């Protein structure tokens, strides 16, 4: 053996893949034997159609070790220059309390959980999200709030469509007042274009001169100005115009709330509550509105219900509004939002409490007032006479020199766009990290003099709130609920967060076999760079020469994704898969426009498609035409051909998922692409199931034109209990000119660019996760992950086949990376539904698979490559044991109304009941398996009453009395 060979043998460069993939050679051999094949290659040959197999391996760099990857990422990060940021414009430096950093952001108990569709095992983060809603409702003085949106700009666009749905005006005009953040205007204009809305801009005082269905105001404005909106809103209402106000939660601790001025909707970002800027995200957007608009409000809403024992329990309310149910009639296409960030912001509010938040706001305002006093003493004029934390200097001949002098001193000011050779206005925003030294440095840089702040501080102290109009000063109380007034020591905070975490099921407890969700490992090494200051503290609108690190990261990741997908270009802007779909369909629409074919607005969608597909198509005012599926779950080719022929002249695109949502690799997918292309249409291939493609096939090779990727599925960004997500889109060469742009970076004299997110790179600070994953896995590791995901799904199918009907299989009797088992025959025989089985799985220590999608009365099971054979067996053993329990009901051994399934889940309180009246034992109820005795996860409530929750909607924190009742 040569030294080189020995070194290769001892190398740790491929170690990450062996840790990410859950099964080794011996385990794989056992699974292959169960399936009945000799090798994993034979299984893949039987599963993936030969026509779509890649002819050669992906050209990716050799895998790197964890230490090498982190070192290379650190080198990239260090190319970012993190100046002191005074840019503002919706993004501010924050101080994330270490107790939240350590116990939430860096805690897999929080970041690996899934969206709380199973409320009995999600009470912790449901409570935290309810706190978030209460926080937003209190600060905005509105009646109901959601539990989050993707960012402030998206929230503004959603508020526009809410105004149209909820209002009585027949107008198609929407007013965007001067003073809105430019990136918000960009996203709103994009959304308006495809609904056929006219955007009218101007001074808010002119609002009532127009016939409008809605208006968007900013308070405080982007220049920092503050004015009472009451009279303006009253005039708008007199003309049946609904008003949305974009606001700042920290400012609202001192300023009169928009709800008190009559606002119909209040939107914004919770970023200021402890969330790093992260070059644009992720951050939780918020929306609050009036009770009467609750059923047309977008986003997930947490509500208070009760469980089967009558005790208070939380759940996601009014889910029938969501895209997976309402499809093209949904209020929005958004699925993943920003749950993890919303939780962090809520904890920030709890930790500081109302007095602590007000103290932070007072300090920020006080420092701003000192800065203003110093500038005025030297004759500088402000564009805004009133302010909270932001001021705008009127243009003068020294403005450019001041801007560059600040840059030289490591300070970023905001430069307002002005015509060439004209003086620029400068914006300055302070935040909770600003010190008196920073203020003195700003005064010196701007005035050219070393001014002492002491005299100005004394002057300001005489009238602390002189910068805020008397009519705009907050007098109402907020955050009065006990939950915001109890957890101010680190010990209390740590224990409260742990209490909530302990209520929830996450990947720290066991596999989460949700089909179409890809709940794989989020390795610790991947998460580390997220909180590095070089990534986390960058302002998204910092000068380009300061963000070379992010630019390099984006370029390298885009090239990796192009290689993996077979596409030619990528945009990393979309903040979620749904937003990626939206951007992809816009690219298709713009492409048709460029060819003079505006009439192409028909979108073909298979009946099995995820609900986001028709919901997104509707956002572009496309006409959705549904294509049927055959009994095997495949797209009905005859029906597809007929509808292509019928709509040939107006066909825009087809949206397909591959492998299909039925969990199989459909034969003939390339022919489908060809038929659509022959008719002049484009192919949108939904990337939700990309985990079954990498290294074996690719969207580009199959023949599609555009796809979004769920980086929070396939590429290891954690789900976070419902966000953050990332949904970048890849396109073929002809669609590259139609990818999203951004007003801050895109040169577009004809204003034809469009934006779907507030920042150019969306949630940029989590991009290192996917970069590191690909770098550490390499071609072989990624391909192996795909193969093992397919192996695991087929192993589960074979183990469950004798006990449950398998609904769909491919040509050779195989499934892709997920399989669907049919519960309907069992329900017909026993009365036991898939919901009963889902709740019983909790007693066995599992999260349920996906319920009733894509077919009602079924389970879709996706194990992912990260699970060991032992974990797969534990799940299969649980499902088989449950089948035996169902048999006892069928045989009459247990009553149909009193058995372990209909009473599931069982709690610790159930175990300790003084009288046990059921026809089965306590042990069977609570400890049905050996594993449940060794390591028991306990649901904290009994089955939640969904109907009661929607009929008696409560979306605020319960009273202290209800907590005592628990």
Swiss-Prot record:
The keyword Protein transport does not apply. Keywords: Oxidoreductase, Pyridoxal phosphate. One of its GO terms (cellular component) is glycine cleavage complex. It catalyses: N(6)-[(R)-lipoyl]-L-lysyl-[glycine-cleavage complex H protein] + glycine + H(+) = N(6)-[(R)-S(8)-aminomethyldihydrolipoyl]-L-lysyl-[glycine-cleavage complex H protein] + CO2. GO terms for biological process: glycine decarboxylation via glycine cleavage system. Its EC number is 1.4.4.2. Its cofactor is pyridoxal 5'-phosphate. It comes from the Bacteria. The modification N6-(pyridoxal phosphate)lysine is found at residue 713. GO terms for molecular function: glycine binding; glycine dehydrogenase (decarboxylating) activity; pyridoxal phosphate binding. The glycine cleavage system is composed of four proteins: P, T, L and H. Belongs to the GcvP family. PANTHER family: GLYCINE DEHYDROGENASE (DECARBOXYLATING), MITOCHONDRIAL, GLYCINE DEHYDROGENASE, DECARBOXYLATING. The glycine cleavage system catalyzes the degradation of glycine. The P protein binds the alpha-amino group of glycine through its pyridoxal phosphate cofactor; CO(2) is released and the remaining methylamine moiety is then transferred to the lipoamide cofactor of the H protein. This is Glycine dehydrogenase (decarboxylating). It comes from Psychromonas ingrahamii (strain DSM 17664 / CCUG 51855 / 37). The gene is gcvP.
């Amino acid at each position: 053996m040569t030294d080189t060979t020995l070194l290769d043998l001892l190398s740790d460069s491929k170690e990450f893949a062996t840790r990410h993939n859950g099964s080794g050679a011996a385990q794989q051999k056992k699974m292959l034997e169960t399936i009945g094949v000799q090798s994993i290659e034979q299984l893949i040959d039987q599963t993936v159609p030969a026509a779509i197999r890649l002819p050669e391996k992906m050209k990716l760099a050799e895998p790197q070790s964890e230490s090498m990857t982190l070192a290379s990422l650190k080198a990239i990060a260090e190319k970012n220059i993190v100046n002191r940021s005074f840019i503002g414009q919706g993004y501010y430096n924050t101080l994330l309390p270490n107790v939240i950093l350590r116990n939430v952001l860096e805690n897999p108990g929080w970041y690996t959980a899934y969206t709380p569709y199973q409320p009995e095992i999600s009470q912790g983060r449901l409570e935290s999200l309810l706190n978030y809603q209460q926080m937003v409702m209190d600060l905005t003085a509105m009646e109901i709030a959601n539990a989050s949106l993707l960012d402030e700009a998206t929230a503004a666009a959603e508020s526009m469509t809410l105004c149209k749905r909820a209002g009585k005006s027949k107008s198609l005009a929407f007013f965007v007042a001067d003073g809105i953040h430019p990136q918000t205007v960009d996203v709103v204009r994009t959304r308006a274009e495809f609904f056929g809305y006219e955007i009218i801009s101007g001074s808010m005082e002119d609002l009532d001169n127009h016939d409008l269905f809605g208006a968007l105001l900013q308070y405080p404005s982007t220049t920092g100005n503050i004015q009472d909106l009451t009279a303006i809103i009253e005039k708008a209402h007199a003309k049946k115009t609904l008003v949305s106000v974009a606001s700042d939660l920290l400012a609202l601790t001192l300023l009169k709330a928009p709800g008190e001025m009559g606002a119909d909707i209040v939107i914004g970002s919770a970023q200021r509550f402890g969330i790093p800027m992260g070059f644009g995200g992720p951050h939780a957007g918020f929306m609050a509105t009036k009770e009467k608009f609750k059923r047309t409000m977008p986003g997930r809403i947490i509500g208070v219900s009760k469980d089967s024992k009558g005790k208070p329990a939380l759940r996601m309310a009014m889910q029938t509004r969501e895209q997976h149910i309402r499809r093209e009639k949904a209020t929005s296409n958004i699925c993943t939002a920003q749950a993890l960030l919303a939780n962090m912001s809520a904890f920030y509010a709890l930790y500081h409490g109302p007095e602590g938040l007000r103290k932070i706001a007072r300090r920020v305002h006080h420092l701003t007032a000192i800065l203003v006093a110093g500038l005025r003493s030297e004759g500088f004029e402000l564009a805004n006479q009133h302010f909270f934390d932001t001021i705008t200097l009127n243009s003068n001949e020294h403005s450019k020199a001041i801007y560059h002098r600040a840059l030289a001193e490591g300070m970023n000011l905001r430069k307002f766009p002005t015509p060439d050779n004209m003086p620029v206005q400068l914006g300055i925003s302070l935040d909770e990290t600003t010190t008196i030294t920073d203020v003195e440095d700003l005064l010196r840089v701007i005035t050219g003099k070393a001014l002492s702040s002491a005299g100005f501080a004394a002057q300001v102290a005489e009238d602390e709130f002189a910068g805020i109009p008397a009519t705009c000063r907050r007098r109402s109380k907020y955050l009065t609920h006990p939950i915001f007034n109890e957890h101010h020591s680190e010990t209390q905070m740590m224990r409260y967060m742990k209490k909530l975490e302990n209520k929830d099921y996450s990947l720290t407890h066991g596999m989460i076999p949700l089909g179409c969700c890809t709940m794989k490992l989020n390795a610790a090494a991947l998460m580390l760079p997220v909180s590095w200051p070089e990534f986390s503290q960058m302002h998204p609108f910092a000068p380009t020469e300061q963000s070379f690190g992010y630019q390099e990261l984006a370029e390298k990741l885009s090239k990796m994704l192009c290689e993996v997908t077979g596409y030619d270009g990528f945009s990393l802007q979309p903040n979620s898969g749904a937003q990626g779909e939206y951007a992809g369909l816009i690219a298709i629409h713009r492409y048709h426009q460029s060819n003079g074919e505006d009439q192409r607005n028909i979108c073909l969608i298979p009946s099995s498609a995820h609900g986001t597909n028709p919901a997104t198509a509707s956002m572009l005012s496309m006409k959705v035409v549904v294509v049927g599926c055959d009994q095997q779950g495949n797209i009905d080719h005859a029906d597809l051909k007929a509808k292509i022929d019928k709509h040939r002249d107006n066909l825009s695109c087809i949206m397909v998922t591959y492998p299909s949502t039925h969990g199989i690799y459909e034969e003939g997918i390339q022919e489908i692409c060809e038929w659509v292309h022959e008719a002049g249409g484009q192919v949108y291939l939904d990337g939700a199931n990309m985990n079954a493609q990498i290294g074996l096939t690719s969207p580009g090779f199959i023949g599609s034109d555009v796809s979004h990727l769920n980086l929070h599925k396939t590429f290891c960004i954690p789900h976070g209990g419902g966000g953050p997500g990332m949904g970048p889109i890849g396109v073929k060469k002809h669609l590259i000119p139609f990818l999203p742009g951004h007003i801050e970076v895109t040169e577009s004299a004809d204003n034809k660019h469009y934006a779907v997110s507030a920042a150019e790179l969306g949630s940029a600070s989590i991009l290192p996760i996917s970069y590191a994953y690909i770098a550490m896995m390499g071609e072989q590791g990624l391909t192996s992950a795909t193969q093992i995901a397919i192996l695991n799904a087929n192993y589960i199918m074979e183990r469950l086949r004798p006990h449950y009907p398998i609904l769909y299989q491919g040509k050779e009797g195989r499934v892709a990376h997920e399989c669907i088992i049919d519960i309907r025959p069992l329900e017909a025989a026993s009365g036991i539904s898939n919901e009963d089985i889902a709740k019983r799985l909790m007693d066995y220590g599992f999260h349920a698979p996906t319920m009733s999608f894509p077919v009602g009365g079924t389970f879709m099971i996706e194990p992912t490559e990260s699970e060991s054979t032992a974990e797969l067996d534990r799940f299969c053993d649980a499902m088989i044991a449950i089948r035996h329990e169902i048999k006892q009901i069928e045989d009459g051994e247990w009553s149909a109304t009193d058995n372990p399934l209909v009473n599931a889940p069982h709690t610790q309180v159930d175990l300790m009941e003084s009288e046990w009246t059921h026809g089965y034992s306590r042990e069977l109820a609570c400890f049905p398996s050996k594993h449940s005795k060794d390591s028991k996860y306990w649901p904290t409530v009994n089955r939640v009453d969904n109907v009661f929750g929607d009929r008696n909607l409560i979306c605020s924190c319960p009273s202290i009395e209800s907590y005592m009742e628990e």
